[in-house]
Amino acid sequence: MMKFKKSFVITSLALSIFSASIMTTAVAANVIPTQTQQASIRYDQSMDIFHPIYAKNGMVATEQALATQVGLDILKQGGNAVDAAVAVGFALAVVLPNAGNIGGGGFMVVYDAKTKQSVALDFREMAPLKATRDMYLDQDGNVVDGRSLFTHLAIGVPGTVAGMEHALKKWGTMSLAQVIAPSIELADKGFVVSETLGQTLETEKDNLAKWQDSKRIFFKNDAPFTVGDLLVQKDLAKSLQLIAQQGGKAFYEGEIAQKIVTEMEKHGGLITLEDMKNYRAIERKPIEGEYRGYKIVTMPPPSSGGIHLVQILNILERYPLQEFGQNSAKAIRHYAEAMKLAYADRSEYLGDPDFVQIPVTGLISKKYAGELATTITTDTIRPSSEIKPGKPHPYESDQTTHYSIMDKDGNAVAVTYTLNLNFGSGIVAEGTGILLNNEMDDFSAKPGTPNAFGLIGGDANAVAAQKRPLSSMTPTIVMKDDKPWLVTGSPGGARIITTVLQSIVNTIDYGMNPAEAIMVPRVHHQWLPDEIRIEEGISPDTINILQEEGYKVVPKATMGKVQIIQAREDGFYGASDPRNPDGLTLGY
C-alpha cells in the first residue's frame, strides 16, 4: 500500500460568507458535482442481523424504559406526538435525573401535520441579568477552577418548563395536568435504580454529597443509591404537582421560583425573580438542507449542531458513499475530511443569534460545500493545522439525553435536552427536589480557555446577560416527499453532530434499517486534536489503510446514544441505541 503524502497547501476558511458572493466563479467552476444516487431503503427479516421495533400507530424512543412507557401511554390515550414528548420530558426528569430535567434546558424540532410546518423550539438556559463577561475570572484575569461548574454561579435560568409548556399549548391536545400525572406518580412512589444510574451516582457522589438536599435525595446511610434500590423523590413530586396545577407560572413566578431564588441568595448565586419571570422559550426557523433528495430539518443556533450537520452532508453528497462501502477506509476518509472542515468553522462563527451575526446561509450553502470539497483529494490528506490554526477541542461526554416520537397523524418530534454535566451543578434547590444545571460553563469564560469539556470558545460565545450559550445538540427530522421519514438525535457533546450524521448516512446511503443504522461502529473527527476516533468493531485492515494514508487512528469509548424512528408505508420502525442498556423503543 502506497503511503499517502500530506498536503501542506494552506487554504483559509475565514471566507467572506456573510455576502452573497461567497463563492467566486473560478472556484465554483471546480466544484465536484453532487451525487444524487441513494441506496434502496429496505427491511428484510431474512437478511438483516439487527431488527427494529415495528408499530402501526405511533412510536416512542427514549434512553429510559419507564419514560418510553409514559410516552406510549399518552399516545394510546389519544394524545399526539407533542403530548407524548412533553410527558416524556417530565418523566425523564424523574427517572433519568443525571440528564433528564426541569432545571435545565434544550431544543425541540416539531413537524406539525396540520399546518405542514416544521418549527425549532429553543428552551436553552439563559444567563442571569447580573451575569458579566469576566464573572469567572480572578483579579489577575485567570479562570477560577470550578466556579462555572460546581457553584451557584454556574446555574443558568432554566428553560425546560417554559419549553414544554409552550410546545403543549401550541401543538398539543392534552392538559399539562394530564401529561405530568405519570411523572408525579413515579416521583412520589419511586422507581428501582438501574445498574446504569447506580454507576452514574457512584461516579458523581462527591459533587452530590456537597449539598444537603442533593445528598438527602440520592444517598442513604452516607452512600449513593445503588442498583435495586427504590429512589423516591417526594419534593420533586410536589414541584411537579404545582406545575401541573398552576402551569409554568408556578416555576417562573410562584413557589418554586421563590425557592430557587432563595437558594441563590443563600449561596451567592445570580438568578433573581426578575430573571425567572422574564424567561421565554423561543420559536426559531429550523436549519433546512437537502441530502440526496431528502430534506434535513434540524436545530439552528444557539445550537451549532444543525448548521454543521447540513454542512457535512453537503460535502459528502458529492461522493458515492454507497460505492465506497459502509465504514470502509475510503468512506471513513471522506467522513474525516468533511468533519474537519465543518468543525474548524464551528470554532469561528457560532454563538447566540440574538447577540452575534452568524453566516447561516453561507455555511449551509451547496456552493460553500463545493469549495470545501475541492480541498479533499484522492492522494493526500490535509493536517488540521493547515486548515486553520487553533487550539484543540478534546471530546465531550454523553451527559445529555435525546428522545424521538412519531404518531399516526404524521406529527413528529425530536428533543435533546440537558443539565450539562451529570446532575448539572449537583445542586438541588432546597425544598424543590429540582436539580439545577451548570450550563453557564458552556459559555467562553475567557476566550481561548477551555470549558469542562475542553471546548475552546471565542468572543461570539462570551458570557453576557440574558444570552444563551452555544450547544452541539442536534435534534433532527428527515423529510421524504414532504412528510417526516426519520426522527433522530443523540447525546454526546461535540460528537452529537457526527453521531446524528452517521445515523442519517447509514439509512440513506447504505439502506440500513433503523436498528442497523445505530448499531454499527462510529467514527469521529473534530478538526483538533487531529485524529480519527473510532469505536470497537472497525476492521483492523481498515485501520491499517487509514494509518498508511497518514491518519492517526485512536480507539475510544462509545459515542452517542441514538434514539431513532423511521416512518414507512406500513408503519413505524425504530430502535434505541444499545450503547445505553436502559433505553427502549415501544410502539402500538
List PLM regions with ranges.
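Active-site rim segments in enzyme catalytic domains, especially the processed small/beta chain
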Residues: V94-A120, L270-T272, A412-K480, Y510, ...
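Internal maturation/activation junctions in enzymes
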Residues: R318-T418, G431-T432, P447-G448
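Noncatalytic scaffold domains of N-terminal-nucleophile
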Residues: N30-Q69, A81-V82, V86-G247, F251-E253, ...
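Extended C-terminal subregions enriched in glycine
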Residues: K467, D509-A557
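Bacterial N-terminal signal peptides
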Residues: S12-I22
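Alpha-helical support elements that line or immediately flank enzyme active sites
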Residues: I74-L75, A162-K170, Q246-E253, Q258, ...
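Bacterial N-terminal signal peptides that target proteins for export
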Residues: M2-S12
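Short beta-strand scaffold segments in enzyme catalytic cores
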Residues: G105-D112, T401-I405, P475-I477, K561-A567
